[in-house]
UniProtKB/Swiss-Prot annotation:
GO molecular function (one): metal ion binding
Highest taxon listed in the record's lineage: Eukaryota
Organism, scientific name: Vicia faba
InterPro entries assigned: Metalthion_15p
UniProt keyword terms in alphabetical order: Metal-binding, Metal-thiolate cluster
Cystine pairings recorded for this chain: none
Full protein name: Metallothionein-like protein 1A
A family per Pfam: Metallothio_2
Amino acid sequence: MSGCGCGSSCNCGDSCKCNKRSSGLSYSEMETKETKETVVLGFGPAKIHFDGAEMSVASKEEGCKCGDKCTCDPCNC
């Protein structure tokens, strides 16, 4: 999964601060060239890995995703 701490301290990973609900659950749609998947997180550790596939991740509310070199792309915290 992708996560961003927006601004000059952008970071990718589980510490994403964008679009966090108070329940700790998050909703994401993941697209590759061949498939589209919906992922609901918060019930256990998220470990998603695609080999050799281009992937984009965006939350339901157009939050943030990490782009090249750990940039927030886009980020609406």
